[in-house]
Amino acid sequence: MAHAPASCPSSRNSGDGDKGKPRKVALITGITGQDGSYLAEFLLEKGYEVHGIVRRSSSFNTGRIEHLYKNPQAHIEGNMKLHYGDLTDSTCLVKIINEVKPTEIYNLGAQSHVKISFDLAEYTADVDGVGTLRLLDAIKTCGLINSVKFYQASTSELYGKVQEIPQKETTPFYPRSPYGAAKLYAYWIVVNFREAYNLFAVNGILFNHESPRRGANFVTRKISRSVAKIYLGQLECFSLGNLDAKRDWGHAKDYVEAMWLMLQNDEPEDFVIATGEVHSVREFVEKSFMHIGKTIVWEGKNENEVGRCKETGKIHVTVDLKYYRPTEVDFLQGDCSKAQQKLNWKPRVAFDELVREMVQADVELMRTNPNA
């Protein structure tokens, strides 16, 4: 049943024992998304008071944080509150920030689907680009420049048509989508506020990161869901776009820790977060099928290519040109050596483990709820 944002009672003792402790209050945009839900969990475990901004909709999409929202007693200390708001509404952002007075803001909210950004270019620019400016301006309006730390979810899509391999903090940007271009504006306005107003503001240039909580319209989750359905006999075949696109894939749970570490750093700096390993969409498909005991062999070329099950002879994968982007990003590989050195961060979950976790989770999900 949908329920409106409201404060959850906390198990934290708010008596004299808390006096003298520094305030740990986080505000997260995009809290209902993959990264936001993992970050909320992470911060609650660290004793933060967590506030999230959610958009009003007829279907209240809090599925990824429902376990936190309903049962805050599971945490030793800390609590959570959700607020209606939108990155396109300056007034509500000022109101929420002034009320919450956060010590850390994590801007994860975005129209984050690259392919869809070609169809919703203006909206993507408004939310992902100008929305970041609205948040930064709200911090300034509320007089919190000297008391808040700001994390901006930047993206490897900034590199687009890559200018060097691997990509690091100093690699020139060349975005290849409205999403990448909007995020480029957000990146530079964060740098500008840091330099102009001395705001502790950082960009986390995160390469692709996945999990069982990944949105169903992203390629990795589309693969894991489809493979699970094939395993359960609910589906025979699914279509993909560019099988040879290569990405640096990590686990979202590892990457939210890096976000937090950036705000605990002595100085505000931008960091690339990645695994340094590259795998193709084709490999993701092959690994996924391996976890259900099937071997995929490829036949044909380009849009006529198919993935056939070696054991049964059935075609399970086809290529559809409609899933190609107008301008493709063929290869992304991150160099996170700066984060390893300065933040002592490194990825924990290996590619094979990530794929297995996603397929297993979707097998369980599709078994209990085929229409999920």
From Swiss-Prot:
One of its GO terms (biological process) is GDP-mannose metabolic process. Belongs to the NAD(P)-dependent epimerase/dehydratase family. GDP-mannose 4,6-dehydratase subfamily. Inhibited by GDP-fucose. Signal peptide: none annotated. GO terms for molecular function: GDP-mannose 4,6-dehydratase activity; identical protein binding; NADP+ binding. Gene3D superfamilies: NAD(P)-binding Rossmann-like Domain, UDP-galactose 4-epimerase, domain 1. Its cofactor is NADP(+). It comes from the Eukaryota. The modification Phosphotyrosine is found at residue 323. Keywords: Acetylation, Lyase, NADP, Phosphoprotein. This is GDP-mannose 4,6 dehydratase. Residues 1-22 are annotated as: Disordered. Catalyzes the conversion of GDP-D-mannose to GDP-4-dehydro-6-deoxy-D-mannose. It is an enzyme of class 4 (lyase). PANTHER family: GDP-MANNOSE 4,6 DEHYDRATASE (PTHR43715:SF1), GDP-MANNOSE 4,6-DEHYDRATASE (PTHR43715). Its EC number is 4.2.1.47.
